From Swiss-Prot:
Membrane topology: Multi-pass membrane protein
Gene Ontology cellular component annotations, sorted alphabetically: chloroplast thylakoid membrane; photosystem I; photosystem II
Subunit composition and interactions: The LHC complex consists of chlorophyll a-b binding proteins.
Residue positions binding chlorophyll b 1: Y58
Segments crossing the lipid bilayer: 100-120, 152-172, 181-201, 220-240
Parts forming coiled coils: none
Protein species of origin: Pinus thunbergii (Japanese black pine)
Residue numbers binding chlorophyll b 2: R104, I153, L182
Entry protein name: Chlorophyll a-b binding protein type I, chloroplastic
Length: 266
């Protein structure tokens, strides 16, 4: 009896001594898991003015009748959905992913349309700096020389470029959607980890603000790309050359002047 009591007392004492350490371990593990969960699933920072019911709306104080399904949970939600395209949660999730991906491509595309032409205007020699004419250089005798330097790797086959693009982009997109050793279990739109080497999204509040900036700049870039396409069709010039022409003679070179004189096919 005494022996059993001693063993029981010893067991209780041991549990008492171990409990603080166990609690501390559980606390640390729980904190780590919470950080991982937050890093992977955080959608917004409640403190940000761009989220929640009091976020800015598309018509400011005159915005009435905001759809109930637009709660301000996601970045770029200004409460505007007159066609109710986001009413279905699955459709909304799909469209949101499509928008973010297109925003990123548009930002890269807008930079690619402007930057080479801007460099060419400042003395850097290109074979062809205008974005919608550059690709046609692959059909020339020497192929497409990068930066106008024939000593660099150059492209001579449109089929080879197409195949490389399909294969490489297909692998990257499949990896993003399906996950892999670097992206498994992470948000496909914001995987973080190895895809965020600078740690820009480590802070949830900063990440929420960056998401808003990304979607706003991406939407602007998509409109810019649309404008570049229209400029190419109407004027046959690149965006920088069109800008220079407009600054030189704003009256003769503007959207209204081209719209009133434009004849398709001429």
């Amino acid at each position: 009896m005494a022996t059993a009591s001693a063993i029981q007392s010893s067991s209780l004492a041991g549990q008492t001594l171990l409990r603080p350490q166990q609690n501390e371990l559980v606390k640390k593990v729980g904190t780590a898991q919470a950080r991982i969960t937050m890093r992977r699933t955080v959608r917004s920072a409640p403190e940000s003015i761009w989220y929640g019911p009091d976020r800015p709306k598309y018509l400011g104080p005159f915005s009435e009748g905001t759809p109930s399904y637009l709660t301000g949970e996601f970045p770029g939600d200004y409460g505007w959905d007159t066609a109710a395209v986001s009413a279905d949660p699955e459709t909304f999730a799909k469209n949101r992913e499509l928008e973010v991906i297109h925003c990123r491509w548009a930002m890269l595309g807008a930079l690619g349309c402007v930057f080479p032409e801007l460099l060419a205007k400042n003395g850097l020699k290109f074979g062809e700096a205008v974005w919608f004419k550059a690709g046609a250089q692959i059909f020339s005798e020497g192929g497409l020389d990068y930066a106008g330097n024939p000593n660099l790797i150059h492209a001579q086959s449109i089929l080879a470029i197409w195949a490389c693009q399909v294969v490489l982009m297909g692998l990257i997109e499949g990896y993003r959607v399906g996950g892999g050793t670097l992206g498994e279990g992470l948000d496909p739109l914001l995987p973080g980890g190895a895809f965020d080497p600078l740690g820009l999204a480590d802070d949830p509040e900063a990440c929420a603000e960056l998401k808003v900036k990304e979607i706003k700049n991406g939407r602007l870039a998509m409109f810019s790309m649309f404008g570049f396409f229209v400029q190419a069709i109407v004027t046959g010039k690149g965006p920088i050359e069109n800008l220079y022409d407009h600054l030189a003679d704003p009256v003769a070179n503007n959207a209204w002047a081209y719209a009133t004189n434009f004849v398709p096919g001429k």
